[in-house]
Amino acid sequence: MATFKVTLINEAEGTKHEIEVPDDEYILDAAEEQGYDLPFSCRAGACSTCAGKLVSGTVDQSDQSFLDDDQIEAGYVLTCVAYPTSDVVIQTHKEEDLY
């Protein structure tokens, strides 16, 4: 099992946190376990509350059912169902940017 460095950036609050996330754990779950409060609602990849934008790196979010292909190509991720597949940098709190 690999572990990756996930950097979570909240531009609105000016915060940046680095966490370690195993490749078999969702980013949202790992962030909560490490004391970081990210937005969420359904925890099933079926809404956009936890949306973030990938700045760099790759994730597996094949469990999600909300984002369309254009949004995924634009770099949007649902942290509740995203596994890191490399070190990643994600801008959090991006739900409003989807619309």
UniProtKB/Swiss-Prot annotation:
Domain of life: Bacteria
Pfam families xrefs: Fer2 (PF00111)
Keywords: 2Fe-2S, Electron transport, Iron, Iron-sulfur, Metal-binding, Transport
Cofactor: [2Fe-2S] cluster
2Fe-2S ferredoxin-type domain residues: 4-96
Cofactor note: Binds 1 [2Fe-2S] cluster.
GO molecular function, one term: metal ion binding
InterPro entries: 2Fe-2S_ferredoxin-like_sf, 2Fe-2S_ferredoxin-type, 2Fe2S_fd_BS, Beta-grasp_dom_sf, Fd_pln
Entry annotated with the keyword Methyltransferase: no
TM stretches of this protein: none
Role, per record: Ferredoxins are iron-sulfur proteins that transfer electrons in a wide variety of metabolic reactions.
UniProt record similarity statement: Belongs to the 2Fe2S plant-type ferredoxin family.
Protein known as: Ferredoxin-1
Species this protein is from: Nostoc sp. (strain PCC 7120 / SAG 25.82 / UTEX 2576)
